Amino acid sequence: MGMIIRTPKRIHLGLIDPTGSLGRRFGSLGVALEGGYEVKVLPAERLEVKAEGEDVETIKKAVERMNSAFGTGTGYLIEVRKAIPRHVGLGSTTQLSLAVGTAIARLNNLNVSIEKLAEVLGRGKNSGAGIYAFAYGGFVLDGGVKEGIPPLILHEEFPGEWAFLLVIPEVKPGLDEEEEKPIMSGNFGDVNVAMEISHRILLGLLPALKERNVRAFGEHLSAIQRLVGRHFAEFQGGEFREDVELILDWLGKKTYGAGQSSWGPTVYGLILKAEFQRLSAELNDHLKEHGIRAKVELGLPRNTGAEVVSENAFLERLIRSVGGS
């Protein structure tokens, strides 16, 4: 019997303190969205991977790491049925790695915490946002890296009537892990900026989330994103990537708050779900007018973590959904 895993994707709302001034580096926040990976994992005589591009190597590494840590073997048929685009800022590597690791753990009756699983799979070295989005969904905030995986500080349901206008322009991909390694391992950032980000999170963003105040949340989100951009300006040519600034300028004027997810190129604007059709039409006109090729999507919040079910249960649910018996 096999397992079916459906993950979220995540947008990254920023890193707090790269300086490590209080003994912990980074600290991250993010939101889980619908539309992640769907992966099927079956026991098999040998490893067979049905996936495209870099997903193949990510899967092989996950299988090897699980076997090295837990002796779970390498005999699996792993098929990626739906995927998150690579290197666009939506957390594909972490979601796929955790999906494969979770399935292998379940198939071998292993009870492993999400933190241990992430550590084994080499995830969470700089940010816990993707790990906790996978585990719990919703809005997540971690407490920064000291030793091991950054601890989860807050998990909060994200309002279902809120959404994100996602824009993925056809430009240079975001940095991959090897490209970002020398940056993230170096000394950079501004402690005063980190203090202002922290202030905005604690007394701005989080109260607005608790009170379901979309305007206040968006205002603080935009401010936090600009501040985070100051940490990374020397590496990306400014507070945001130059090739997304025109889109971000539009999002900043038309939505409640806007930002760049991780290294981009995905950018987003906070909206009400009911506003998507109107705003996406206006945005597509704007993109066409300026000759910008981009994919525009509705980013729906997902307030549950990855779904893991047996293949039989998955098929039964599918049959019921189409009116079968």
Please give the residue ranges for each predicted region.
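Short, flexible, solvent-exposed loop/turn segments with mixed acidic/basic and small polar residues
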Residues: 38-41, 255-260
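Short Gly/Ser/Thr- and Asp/Glu-enriched loop/turn motifs at secondary-structure junctions
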Residues: 8, 135, 260-265
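DPxDG-like acidic metal-binding loop motif
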Residues: 90-114, 133-144
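A structural signal for short secondary-structure junctions
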Residues: 32-33, 72, 252, 259-263
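ATP-dependent small-molecule kinase catalytic core of the GHMP/sugar-kinase superfamily
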Residues: 2-6, 12-14, 20-28, 113-254, ...
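ATP-binding N-lobe of GHMP and related small-molecule kinases
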Residues: 1-88, 105-114, 302-305, 309-325
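Glycine/small-residue-rich loop that forms an oxyanion/phosphate-binding "nest" at active or ligand-binding sites
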Residues: 85, 99, 121-124
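Short glycine/threonine-rich catalytic loop with a Thr-x-Gly-x-Asp
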Residues: 89-92, 96, 194, 257-263
